[in-house]
């Protein structure tokens, strides 16, 4: 008789029909690379087996939607490994911890509508009445809440990103305020870009107007062209650098820039004078000069809201001086008018002329308005390049 056949129980890792070179997957954890040996080939007694047997059940589409290798998945030919849409019953969680400690699994809590039906009434009055029940209040407020039904403020826990915009549990942000806060700077930026574009066209417009004064019949071709530097036909206001008229165009635009700068400085000077920021002493009666300084003893005290200097003084003759207050507004204008009137006596007639114009009848004013309307288009064509500067001047006048 032959020796009895001894059948050795093959471990799960000994099935090498499916490629598993590193012995990583749960089905082949008894490969030699997974520290399996002939002394412990059995799955139940091998200490090196996987402690997570649920990993064998790969979720549907775990390797991508519809990914099925032609020779089977890496985990075998199971439907789950091949991505077939099959539903596996969920196994209950292991109760090893509960068995060791002697505890039974925690039962599933019944729904709130079965245990506390009064809490499902979302009427405000009934809801607050339901909160009087300690069991209901314990569901909504944490431990240590006040017995009056008010909730103790919980510490706000917010991420770095959310804390920048709003706090957790805070009121929702008002999108109208956010929109208005973003819309304002965008409108200002658009207005600035528009005005800047228009301002950059002022030199070209004034150059065209300046050149048109020499050619009443219209702007002809540039007369600076010659055979030595042939250029295409162009206007005198758009000469290329190769044209001899280019230097004259640059000179005209430089003068125009200086004129615009002078205009802006005059406007700033008028604005500062209107605000009373130019403390200029007026001319003293019967004198063409003034002396500014702190008057310690004055025959007449200065009255006014002048800040610097305290008053305007004449040169003391007998130890005392006459103090005249500085005007709170238009101090420079009054000084220039008095200075010009003292040297040009005919300017005093303009005051009488202005007073006479104020007393004119409405018929005369209608005639003046008609004349302005008749000559207005020509004036508008001349003043149109300066229109973009008007909003800037108005803004400075109001803000300062």
UniProtKB/Swiss-Prot annotation:
Post-translational changes noted in the entry: Isoform M is N-terminally acetylated by host at a ratio of 90%, and N-glycosylated by host at the pre-S2 region. Myristoylated.
Region feature (Pre-S): 2-174
Lipidation (N-myristoyl glycine): 2
GO biological process, one term: caveolin-mediated endocytosis of virus by host cell
Superkingdom field: Viruses
Keyword Coiled coil tagged: no
UniProt region (Pre-S1), positions on chain: 2-119
Cellular component per GO, a single term: membrane
Biotech uses: Systematic vaccination of individuals at risk of exposure to the virus has been the main method of controlling the morbidity and mortality associated with hepatitis B. The first hepatitis B vaccine was manufactured by the purification and inactivation of HBsAg obtained from the plasma of chronic hepatitis B virus carriers. The vaccine is now produced by recombinant DNA techniques and expression of the S isoform in yeast cells. The pre-S region do not seem to induce strong enough antigenic response.
Compartmental location: Virion membrane
UniProt xrefs under Pfam families: vMSA (PF00695)
Residues exposed to the Intravirion side: 2-253, 203-253, 370-375
Region (Pre-S2): 120-174
Record key words, sorted: Acetylation, Caveolin-mediated endocytosis of virus by host, Fusion of virus membrane with host endosomal membrane, Fusion of virus membrane with host membrane, Glycoprotein, Host-virus interaction, Lipoprotein, Membrane, Myristate, Transmembrane, Transmembrane helix, Viral attachment to host cell, Viral envelope protein, Viral penetration into host cytoplasm, Virion, Virus endocytosis by host, Virus entry into host cell
Family: Belongs to the orthohepadnavirus major surface antigen family.
Official protein name in the record: Large envelope protein
Organism name: Hepatitis B virus genotype F2 (isolate Brazil/w4B)
């Amino acid at each position: 008789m032959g020796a009895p056949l001894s059948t050795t129980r093959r471990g799960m890792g000994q099935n090498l029909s499916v490629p598993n070179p590193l012995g990583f997957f749960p089905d082949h954890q008894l490969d030699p690379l997974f520290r399996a040996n002939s002394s412990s080939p059995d799955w139940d007694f091998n200490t090196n087996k996987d402690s997570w047997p649920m990993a064998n059940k790969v979720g549907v589409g775990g390797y991508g939607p519809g990914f099925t290798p032609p020779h089977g998945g890496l985990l075998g030919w199971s439907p789950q490994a091949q991505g077939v849409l099959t539903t596996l019953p969920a196994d209950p969680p292991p109760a090893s911890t509960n068995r060791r400690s002697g505890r039974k699994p925690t039962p599933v809590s019944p729904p709130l509508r079965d245990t506390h039906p009064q809490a499902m009434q979302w009427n405000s009055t009934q809801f607050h009445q339901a909160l009087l029940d300690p069991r209901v209040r314990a569901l909504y407020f944490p431990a240590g809440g006040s017995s009056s039904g008010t909730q103790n403020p919980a510490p706000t826990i917010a991420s770095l990103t959310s804390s920048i915009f709003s706090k957790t549990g805070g009121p929702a942000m008002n999108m109208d305020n956010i929109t208005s806060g973003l819309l304002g700077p965008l409108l200002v930026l658009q207005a600035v870009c528009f005005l800047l574009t228009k301002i950059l066209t002022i030199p070209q417009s004034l150059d065209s107007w300046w050149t048109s004064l020499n050619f009443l019949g219209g702007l002809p071709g540039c007369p600076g062209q010659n055979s030595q530097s042939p250029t295409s036909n162009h206007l005198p206001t758009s000469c290329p650098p190769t044209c001899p008229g280019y230097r004259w165009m640059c000179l005209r635009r430089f003068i125009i820039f200086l004129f615009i700068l002078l205009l802006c400085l005059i406007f700033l000077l008028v604005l500062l004078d209107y605000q009373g920021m130019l403390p200029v002493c007026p001319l003293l009666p019967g004198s063409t000069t003034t002396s500014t300084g702190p008057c310690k003893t004055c025959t007449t005290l200065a009255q006014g809201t002048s800040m610097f200097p305290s008053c305007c003084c004449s040169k003391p003759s007998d130890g005392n001086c006459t103090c005249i207050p500085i005007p709170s507004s238009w101090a420079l204008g009054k000084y220039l008018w008095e200075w010009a009137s003292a040297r040009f006596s005919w300017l005093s007639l303009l005051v009488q002329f202005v007073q006479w114009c104020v007393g004119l009848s409405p018929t005369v004013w209608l005639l003046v308005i008609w004349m302005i309307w008749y000559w207005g288009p020509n004036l508008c064509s001349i003043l149109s390049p300066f229109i973009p500067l008007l909003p800037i001047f108005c803004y400075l006048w109001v803000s300062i």
